[in-house]
């Protein structure tokens, strides 16, 4: 009985936090916010299309560790270790300088008003749009955490690139996201790149991989650990800089670069979703947008909780 009561209390608190988020949160206090963010992101993505994937990844990593609170952006301080150097994020997340540039411009225009957590949410949406993907209404009103959680970032809440389908399902379920949400959000791998160290085991040892695909990837990813670890390969071979459904088509051909990608189509319960998204771009776009909105609702700080950081890299 106690467990049921506690669960109901958690659900009530979550729904209250979500209710405080809305698209028009800055309509009066910072009306040009969306325009300023879009301009900076557009310039960054035009200069380097891969940056769109990086900015989207920042939002995912932030939300999965203690909620969408901007904690990922914090540098180390004497009192805590930041999340940037945690296992899942070290040498993986990037784009912080783009967020810094947006924050600088927004602070000049609307000082002390817009949170870094909300800037992450908007940049994720704009990055997808600028690379040809779907748009969605970004709910705003998050506040920033005053600390980071290095231990939580290393606790497995962010699934590793070598993982099982059941672990993926469970990790997303723990965040309030369904299996459908997980498969749709995995479609973000239709853009971006991965380092050799994350897919070496798959291209040399996996059985559920297209042989010619594996051989082609081995040319730039030596079998020896420590050799060429940081060399990169596109997650989507055909259209790496366009947000489409090519990722799912690759899975049907056993050409998923990461183990955590190919497990989505490997004679399991998510096969039907992969097939559906590979055939229907609009269905993928619809479910991806819905899942992004749900992900943005993960444990936000609202009301008087947290703060509005003046600099995204450090607490006030």
From Swiss-Prot:
Q: List the disulfide bonds.
A: 30-110, 63-68, 116-312, 196-221
- The answer to whether the entry has keyword Calcium is yes
Cofactor note as given: Binds 1 heme b (iron(II)-protoporphyrin IX) group per subunit. Binds 2 calcium ions per subunit.
Q: What is its EC number?
A: 1.11.1.7
Glycosylated residues (UniProt): 205
Q: Where is this site: Transition state stabilizer?
A: 57
What the entry lists under Pfam families is as follows: peroxidase
Question: Which residues are involved in binding substrate?
Answer: 159
Task: Give the annotated active site.
Answer: 61 (proton acceptor)
According to the UniProt entry, which residues carry Pyrrolidone carboxylic acid? Answer: 20
GO terms, molecular function: heme binding; lactoperoxidase activity; metal ion binding
A GO CC term assigned to this protein in UniProt: extracellular region
Q: Name one GO biological process term.
A: response to oxidative stress
Leader sequence range is 1-19
Which InterPro entries does this chain map to? Haem_peroxidase, Haem_peroxidase_sf, Peroxidase_pln, Peroxidases_AS, Peroxidases_heam-ligand_BS, Secretory_peroxidase
- Enzyme class, broadest EC rank: oxidoreductase
Q: What does the entry list as the binding residues for Ca(2+) 2?
A: 190, 236, 239, 244
Enzymatic reactions:
2 a phenolic donor + H2O2 = 2 a phenolic radical donor + 2 H2O
Residues binding Ca(2+) 1: 62, 65, 67, 69, 71
Compartment(s) of residence:
Secreted
Q: Any additional notes?
A: There are 73 peroxidase genes in A.thaliana.
Name the job this protein performs.
Removal of H(2)O(2), oxidation of toxic reductants, biosynthesis and degradation of lignin, suberization, auxin catabolism, response to environmental stresses such as wounding, pathogen attack and oxidative stress. These functions might be dependent on each isozyme/isoform in each plant tissue.
Q: What is this protein called?
A: Peroxidase 67
Gene it is expressed from? PER67
């Amino acid at each position: 009985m106690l467990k049921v009561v506690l669960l109901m209390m958690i659900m009530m608190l979550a729904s209250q936090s979500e209710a405080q988020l809305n698209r028009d949160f800055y309509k009066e206090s910072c009306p040009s916010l969306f325009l300023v963010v879009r301009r900076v992101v557009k310039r960054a993505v035009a200069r380097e299309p891969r940056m769109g994937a990086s900015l989207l990844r920042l939002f995912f990593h932030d939300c999965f560790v203690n909620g969408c609170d901007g904690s990922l952006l914090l540098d180390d301080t004497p009192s805590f270790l930041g999340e940037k150097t945690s296992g899942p994020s070290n040498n993986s997340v990037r784009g912080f300088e783009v967020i810094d540039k947006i924050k600088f411009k927004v602070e000049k225009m609307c000082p002390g008003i817009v949170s870094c957590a909300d800037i992450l949410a908007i940049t994720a949406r704009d990055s997808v749009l600028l690379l040809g993907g779907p748009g969605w209404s970004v709910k705003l009103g998050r506040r920033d955490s005053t600390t980071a959680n290095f231990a939580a970032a290393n606790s497995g809440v962010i699934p590793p690139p070598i993982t099982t389908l059941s672990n993926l399902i469970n990790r997303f379920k723990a965040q309030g996201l369904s299996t459908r949400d997980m498969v749709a959000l995995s479609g973000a791998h239709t853009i971006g790149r991965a380092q050799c160290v994350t897919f070496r085991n798959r291209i040399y040892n996996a059985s559920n991989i297209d042989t010619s695909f594996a051989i082609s990837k081995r040319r730039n990813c030596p079998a020896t650990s420590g050799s060429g670890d940081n060399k990169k390969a596109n997650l989507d071979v055909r259209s790496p800089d366009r947000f489409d459904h090519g990722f799912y088509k690759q899975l049907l051909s056993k050409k998923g670069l990461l183990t955590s990608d190919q497990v989505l189509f490997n004679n399991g319960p998510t096969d039907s979703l992969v097939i559906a998204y590979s055939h229907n771009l609009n269905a993928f776009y619809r479910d991806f947008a819905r899942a992004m909105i749900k992900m943005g609702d993960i444990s936000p700080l609202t009301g008087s909780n947290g703060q509005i950081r003046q600099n995204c890299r450090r607490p006030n």
